[in-house]
């Protein structure tokens, strides 16, 4: 069983992953779920939180992790992804990959015979968003009809937030400049899931005030990701500032609204120091929760093994 996006999860699957995450957070050590199992951790781009949290997760579950960076593995260069996937499947029990192109993940999953986990791709960031959900849940907020407003670039995080929100019956607002909307395939999938469950909603807007009004959660991410080579910095500086999460925007939300950012943050750009360091900010709890969620994800993909 792979974890490439969230849209293959049923609501009960997502709830079980969050339930297991809470258990692992309360009981961090002493597990042997991954005893005698080897987990490949592939990184095509630099990583701090993802690498540390997955490496620790594997080891704290009793497994062995093997980290390979871009210059240490022939991923479509000198060797086809097909052959790499087939060979790695002979050695390891799970492949965790942070890749530049989502197609790389799909090929690893198609040609390999072991579960593949998306640690980040250009289209989707499921493990991050599961950690976001855990952060929301542990702060006592009910997902059903919760209003989550995302501000900035319609990127991989916003894509995954739409899917997660649809599955759990949330009201998701994605506020982006025009031409920076989230991926159309993910929008379509989210709307299909909303129709399936008959709960929740998805609103795309270029008005951050509308999105922030009475919001339970305000969320942002960097305006320019590491993989964004086509964005003009001056254009971003001109178009994006009104989507910054600052005290003025936060004042439109509910008084007990929480603020999330998946980090790393460009302080003073997408979010101010005042907000990210405030009591309403849960970004460092959110970062820690990557560890606990990823343990639950590893357990989930191996449940039929």
UniProtKB/Swiss-Prot annotation:
<feature type="binding site">
    <location>
        <position position="290"/>
    </location>
    <ligand>
        <name>carbamoyl phosphate</name>
    </ligand>
</feature>
<feature type="binding site">
    <location>
        <begin position="47"/>
        <end position="50"/>
    </location>
    <ligand>
        <name>carbamoyl phosphate</name>
    </ligand>
</feature>
<dbReference type="InterPro" id="IPR024904">
    <property type="entry name" value="OTCase_ArgI"/>
</dbReference>
<dbReference type="Pfam" id="PF02729">
    <property type="entry name" value="OTCace_N"/>
</dbReference>
<feature type="binding site">
    <location>
        <begin position="262"/>
        <end position="263"/>
    </location>
    <ligand>
        <name>carbamoyl phosphate</name>
    </ligand>
</feature>
<keyword id="KW-0055">Arginine biosynthesis</keyword>
<feature type="binding site">
    <location>
        <position position="156"/>
    </location>
    <ligand>
        <name>L-ornithine</name>
    </ligand>
</feature>
<dbReference type="Pfam" id="PF00185">
    <property type="entry name" value="OTCace"/>
</dbReference>
<feature type="binding site">
    <location>
        <position position="221"/>
    </location>
    <ligand>
        <name>L-ornithine</name>
    </ligand>
</feature>
<comment type="similarity">
    <text>Belongs to the aspartate/ornithine carbamoyltransferase superfamily. OTCase family.</text>
</comment>
<keyword id="KW-0963">Cytoplasm</keyword>
<dbReference type="GO" id="GO:0005737">
    <property type="term" value="C:cytoplasm"/>
</dbReference>
<dbReference type="InterPro" id="IPR036901">
    <property type="entry name" value="Asp/Orn_carbamoylTrfase_sf"/>
</dbReference>
<dbReference type="GO" id="GO:0016597">
    <property type="term" value="F:amino acid binding"/>
</dbReference>
<dbReference type="GO" id="GO:0006526">
    <property type="term" value="P:L-arginine biosynthetic process"/>
</dbReference>
<dbReference type="InterPro" id="IPR002292">
    <property type="entry name" value="Orn/put_carbamltrans"/>
</dbReference>
<dbReference type="GO" id="GO:0042450">
    <property type="term" value="P:arginine biosynthetic process via ornithine"/>
</dbReference>
<keyword id="KW-0028">Amino-acid biosynthesis</keyword>
<keyword id="KW-0808">Transferase</keyword>
<dbReference type="GO" id="GO:0019240">
    <property type="term" value="P:citrulline biosynthetic process"/>
</dbReference>
<protein>
    <recommendedName>
        <fullName>Ornithine carbamoyltransferase</fullName>
        <ecNumber>2.1.3.3</ecNumber>
    </recommendedName>
</protein>
<feature type="binding site">
    <location>
        <begin position="125"/>
        <end position="128"/>
    </location>
    <ligand>
        <name>carbamoyl phosphate</name>
    </ligand>
</feature>
<dbReference type="GO" id="GO:0004585">
    <property type="term" value="F:ornithine carbamoyltransferase activity"/>
</dbReference>
<feature type="binding site">
    <location>
        <position position="98"/>
    </location>
    <ligand>
        <name>carbamoyl phosphate</name>
    </ligand>
</feature>
<comment type="pathway">
    <text>Amino-acid biosynthesis; L-arginine biosynthesis; L-arginine from L-ornithine and carbamoyl phosphate: step 1/3.</text>
</comment>
<dbReference type="InterPro" id="IPR006131">
    <property type="entry name" value="Asp_carbamoyltransf_Asp/Orn-bd"/>
</dbReference>
<dbReference type="InterPro" id="IPR006132">
    <property type="entry name" value="Asp/Orn_carbamoyltranf_P-bd"/>
</dbReference>
<feature type="binding site">
    <location>
        <begin position="225"/>
        <end position="226"/>
    </location>
    <ligand>
        <name>L-ornithine</name>
    </ligand>
</feature>
<dbReference type="InterPro" id="IPR006130">
    <property type="entry name" value="Asp/Orn_carbamoylTrfase"/>
</dbReference>
<comment type="function">
    <text>Reversibly catalyzes the transfer of the carbamoyl group from carbamoyl phosphate (CP) to the N(epsilon) atom of ornithine (ORN) to produce L-citrulline.</text>
</comment>
């Amino acid at each position: 069983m792979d974890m490439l996006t969230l849209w293959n999860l049923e609501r009960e699957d997502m709830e079980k992953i969050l339930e297991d995450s809470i258990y692992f957070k309360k009981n961090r050590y002493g597990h042997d779920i991954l005893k005698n199992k080897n987990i490949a951790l592939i990184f095509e781009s630099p990583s701090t939180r993802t690498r540390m949290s997955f490496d620790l997760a594997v080891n704290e579950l009793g497994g062995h992790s093997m980290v390979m960076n871009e210059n240490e593995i022939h991923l479509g260069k000198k060797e086809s992804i097909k052959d790499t996937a087939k060979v790695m499947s002979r050695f390891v029990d799970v492949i965790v990959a942070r890749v530049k192109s989502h197609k790389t993940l799909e090929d690893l999953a198609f040609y390999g015979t072991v579960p593949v986990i998306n640690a980040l791709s250009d289209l989707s960031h499921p493990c991050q968003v599961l950690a976001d959900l855990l952060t929301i849940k542990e702060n006592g907020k009910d997902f059903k009809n919760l209003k989550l407003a995302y501000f900035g670039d319609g990127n991989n995080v916003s894509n995954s937030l739409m899917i997660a929100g649809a599955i759990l019956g949330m009201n998701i607002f994605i506020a982006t400049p025009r031409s920076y909307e989230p991926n159309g395939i993910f929008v379509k999938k989210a709307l299909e899931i909303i129709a399936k469950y008959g709960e929740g909603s998805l609103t795309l807007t270029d008005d951050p005030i509308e999105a922030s009004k009475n919001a339970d959660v305000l969320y942002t991410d960097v305006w320019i990701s590491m993989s964004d080579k086509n964005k003009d910095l001056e254009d971003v500086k001109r178009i994006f500032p009104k989507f910054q999460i600052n005290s003025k925007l936060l004042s439109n939300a509910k008084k007990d609204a929480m603020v999330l950012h998946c980090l790393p943050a460009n302080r003073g750009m997408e979010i101010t120091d005042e907000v990210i360091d405030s009591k309403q900010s849960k970004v460092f709890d959110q970062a820690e929760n990557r560890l606990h969620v990823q343990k639950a994800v590893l357990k989930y993909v191996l449940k039929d093994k």
